[in-house]
Regions:
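A gly/Pro-rich, aromatic-decorated transmembrane alpha-helix motif that marks the paired
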Residues: 25, 63-64, 146-163
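Intracellular juxtamembrane helix-capping segments at the cytosolic ends
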Residues: 114-128
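Intracellular loop-helix junctions on the cytosolic face of multi-pass helical membrane proteins
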Residues: 1-4, 129, 157-245
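Hydrophobic core of transmembrane alpha-helices in multi-pass small-molecule transporters
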Residues: 89, 100-115
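Central cavity-lining transmembrane alpha-helices of secondary-active solute carriers
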Residues: 48-70, 116, 150
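Short amphipathic helix-loop junctions that connect adjacent transmembrane helices
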Residues: 25-46, 241-245
Length: 245
């Protein structure tokens, strides 16, 4: 069997994916819908440029969020902080005014950086002593990802188009908030997993770190390649999509 904590993570991730994909399903439609119908009347090119920039940044910030969790605040607090920021961001988009849309997207980018990498880190630490069960655990976990994505696209998309854009964005924000509350009030079920940053855990244990368990397994060449790829990707993001908006 699997620990009960896995199912807390399952539903937390499911509602986060509901919120994420629900908002994504609405964003381009909202931006390109005529002003008389409540949208912004953007061209497809401009709407997709903003969407692409947002999506790109969402996959960059987890590098920083994972580092902060490892070094300073621990996985569990990172998840809670990220979920709160994302809930505020999505709910602010329900105001459908330029300031709130841009602020909401920015908050979602920042919050996702804390949330995304640390959910899977908690699972990895939960199964540290039972690695043979880890594949099954991640299979169950990603079932929650798929379920949340499907429900979010269907429900938020329908509500946004048929009832109102603000209701669609608001629904995504409400479920993000529910996911955060569920995780926060059930987190004691994880015991000490993710409670402290990895650096503090290693220091407290006073155990020698084996070569395969080092916090930084990368060689100097690996780091150089990572930096080059990251800089090249960031330059492309800043010079291509933004130039079209």
């Amino acid at each position: 069997g699997h620990p009960a904590g896995l199912f807390v993570l399952f539903f937390t991730e499911m509602w986060e994916r509901f919120s994420y994909y629900g908002m994504r399903a609405l964003l381009v439609l909202f931006l390109t819908t005529a002003i008389m119908n409540g949208g912004w009347g953007w061209s497809n090119e401009n709407a997709l440029a903003l969407y692409g920039t947002y999506t790109s940044m969402v996959y960059l910030t987890p590098i920083l969020g994972g580092f902060i969790a490892d070094r300073y605040i621990g996985y569990r607090w990172a998840v809670v902080i990220g979920a709160i920021i994302m809930a505020i961001g999505t709910l602010s988009m329900a105001m459908i005014e330029p300031f709130y849309i841009y602020s909401g997207l920015t908050l979602l980018i920042v919050g996702n950086g804390f949330f995304k990498p640390n959910m899977t880190s908690i699972i990895s630490h939960m199964y540290k002593d039972h690695p043979e069960k880890k594949d099954g655990a991640f299979t169950i976990f990603y079932m929650g990802v798929n379920a949340g994505a499907f429900l979010g696209i269907m429900l938020c998309g329908y509500i946004g188009e048929k009832v109102g854009w603000n209701w669609g964005f608001g629904l995504a924000g409400i479920f993000m908030l529910l996911g955060m509350l569920q995780f926060y009030f059930a987190q004691n079920i994880f015991g000490d997993v993710g409670k402290k940053p990895v650096k503090a855990v290693v220091s407290d244990s006073k155990a020698e770190v084996k070569s395969e368990d080092k916090l930084n397994p990368f060689t100097s060449l690996d780091l150089i390649i990572i930096v080059i790829i990251s800089v090249a990707g960031l330059v492309w993001i800043l010079n291509d999509p933004y130039s079209k908006v």
